[in-house]
């Protein structure tokens, strides 16, 4: 079941400028935005947003890094460093970039923990386990605080997102989907 029956975010065809309208093209797929100009027929596919995250291990004790968010959604709640992948950016490079931007750390990606997606939610979240190789723990303008936590100190009741909780549990349980490429 698809939940794409909201008001379309785009109203005009990017090719010819004619209005777009939602239409069912295949019974097994959600409605697509289609150009009303029959000679154009452009189909606008609304792709999901892709986000990456890194659960960063620091030191021999295996402490992990969490960042307290300074933005909504989840203001004041804890997450691992992460964010959106830019168009054309490699997933692994986005994960490295986000670790540097949000926590001030250069990391080595060790393995893919999992990919998280939820019905009716736009982002698909790709989460890696990583090890700090250099840098000083710091936050950017999207964070209030960055901190190291022992695994038994994780503030479970103050985590920002379902994907944060699920990825941390998978990390602690040792679930590994694949080596990082």
What are the functions of these language-model segments?
Residues 1-12, 54, 170-177, 181:
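A broadly conserved sequence feature marking short terminus-proximal activation segments
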Residues 5-54:
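Acidic, metal-coordinating catalytic segment for phosphate/diphosphate chemistry
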Residues 56-57, 66, 130, 148:
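Conserved hydrophobic "DFG−1" position in protein kinase catalytic cores
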């Amino acid at each position: 079941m698809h939940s794409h029956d909201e008001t379309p975010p785009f109203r005009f065809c990017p090719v010819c400028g004619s209005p777009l309208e939602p239409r069912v093209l295949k019974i097994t797929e959600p409605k697509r935005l289609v150009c009303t100009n029959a000679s154009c027929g452009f189909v606008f596919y609304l792709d999901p947003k892709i986000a990456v995250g890194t659960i960063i291990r620091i030191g021999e004790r295996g402490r992990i890094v969490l960042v307290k968010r300074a933005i909504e959604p989840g203001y004041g709640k804890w997450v691992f460093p992460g964010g959106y992948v830019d168009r054309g950016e490699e997933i692994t490079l986005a994960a490295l970039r986000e670790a540097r931007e949000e926590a001030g750390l250069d990391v080595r990606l060790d393995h893919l923990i999992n990919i998280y997606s939820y019905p009716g939610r736009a982002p698909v979240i790709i989460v890696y386990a990583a090890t700090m190789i250099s840098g000083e723990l710091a936050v950017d303008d999207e964070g209030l605080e960055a901190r190291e936590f022992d695994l038994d100190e994780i503030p479970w009741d103050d985590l920002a997102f379902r994907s944060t909780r699920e990825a941390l549990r998978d990390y602690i349980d040792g679930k590994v989907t694949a080596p990082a490429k």
